[in-house]
Amino acid sequence: MNALLIAGTTSDAGKSVVAAGVCRWLARTGARVAPFKAQNMSNNSVVTPDGGEIGRAQAVQAAACGLEPSVRFNPVLLKPGSDRRSQVVVLGHVSGEVTAMSYRERKAALLDTVVSTLDGLRAEHDHVICEGAGSPAEINLRATDIANMGLARAAGLPVLVVGDIDRGGVFAQLFGTLALLDAADQALVGGFVINKFRGDPALLDSGLDRLRALTGRPVHGVLPWAEDLWLDAEDSLSYVADGVVGRPAPPRGSQWLRVAVPRLPRISNATDVEALAAEPGVAVRFVTEPSRLTDADLVVLPGSKSTVADLGWLHDTGLADAIRAHAGAGLPVVGICGGFQMLTRRITDQVESGVGAVDGLGMLDLEIEFEEAKTLRRPSGTAFGEPVDGYEIHHGVPVRRGDDLAGLVRLPGGTAEGGLSGSVAGTHWHGLFENDAFRRRFLTWAAGCAGRDGFVAAGDTSFAEVRAGQLDLLGDLVEKHLDTDAIRRLLEGGAPAGLPLLPPGAGGRAALRSGGGSE
């Protein structure tokens, strides 16, 4: 068997973190384990060493396994560019754009791709921990599903369903999810996990017993709410406006550095700012109103899957004028990827938006033109005198650069990347702030521009260690709060035979049996 699908009752139920925790727990036992998500819909992505693009959650899960990310861990990635269209990335590379309806026509071929990719991983590893997408009970999508029960059926995977108790109604979520599945799908569901519980778990005992009596399936653990888990959010639902990112430690000096990040409608790789939030004395907030910039020291304009449309949103909300005024007062602004493109004088886009040429914010003397081919690479260079690396995922490229514009990054051959003009900086590089020495120099520069002389950048923050600590915490939570013996049984033997089948999904008016054997 050696593989397990972790599904969830909803988006943001905790599938990604539970999968990462199970990966970490298994890896710490010495097992060769790999992550897998057949289809991910996310604008949070990374570039792999093999030159492709996958969802960030699978890169984090790979790190939990002690592996470099690979396109095989996420063979299909959907990157929404609007409410109706998404870019399709197959095995790391762009494979056209689709609408929800046109995508259905590709599902059969893609199912073959994801199953064969999973088969290869299963042959090479002791265990493969698969993550579902959204909910397996989206009955309008089941006929062409390749990410949840469609994958489980095709690959013979036992399924563990995660429910988020913090939303309320977790027992209805779990029971209803199971009951909506058809009989063959229900037979693969071996149990449940309750996630994000606050308080004394003994309060749940009667509910757990009743759920087992109703479904014939146990809850294999109750994971507590963990305030210290905040890195590498998979879902855009996690980027709440006005909420502080992470759990910032007190400043090393006498002043905080306050960072505002416009929460763009099509924000991508918002996790770039998490490295800033890991620093003592740095308070990072996502914002949607210009008034929220009035007390900010630094504005970070993040990436976007729809640069021109999100630039229009900045104008519509008044944030564009507020960002210009912020920089006009000598206060620091930095743009990353799409945010960097917005800071330039002109953007010509016949690829993402098709609108042609539009004016940027005019804060960096550059012009950007979008190309059909997507740039995917993991470059290195120097910035603020420190060695740096990062990764690039973009269609827009500079086609004109002002003679006097300095680069933020200097490439090995001496070429300038990005831009730096007064208190305004920009780069196409994601992951730049994960370089510890550069991040400290950048924060010191930003504090100087903002007149925050009392802010002192910590000299001992290692973002890699912070991330590793988060993964170890996930592994600890799984080991302490889940029935790991039961998870091993699912991995090795699949879902038990004879599990009850519930109406209406299984038909009939009473619980049926999935086959011989006892409950």
Swiss-Prot record:
Function recorded in the entry: Catalyzes amidations at positions B, D, E, and G on adenosylcobyrinic A,C-diamide. NH(2) groups are provided by glutamine, and one molecule of ATP is hydrogenolyzed for each amidation.
Domain GATase cobBQ-type, first and last residues per copy: 256-438
Pfam families (alphabetical): CbiA, GATase_3
UniProt-recorded name of the protein: Cobyric acid synthase
InterPro entries per UniProt: Class_I_gatase-like, CobQ/CobB/MinD/ParA_Nub-bd_dom, CobQ_GATase1, CobQ_N, CobQ_synth, GATase_3, P-loop_NTPase
Active site: 337, 430
Pathway(s) per entry: Cofactor biosynthesis; adenosylcobalamin biosynthesis
Keywords recorded for this protein, A-Z: Cobalamin biosynthesis, Glutamine amidotransferase
UniProt entry tagged with the keyword Transferase: no
CDD domains in the cross-refs: CobQ_N, GATase1_CobQ
Organism: Saccharopolyspora erythraea (strain ATCC 11635 / DSM 40517 / JCM 4748 / NBRC 13426 / NCIMB 8594 / NRRL 2338)
Molecular function terms from GO: ABC-type vitamin B12 transporter activity; catalytic activity
Family: Belongs to the CobB/CobQ family. CobQ subfamily.
Gene Ontology biological-process entries: cobalamin biosynthetic process
Keyword Glycosyltransferase: no
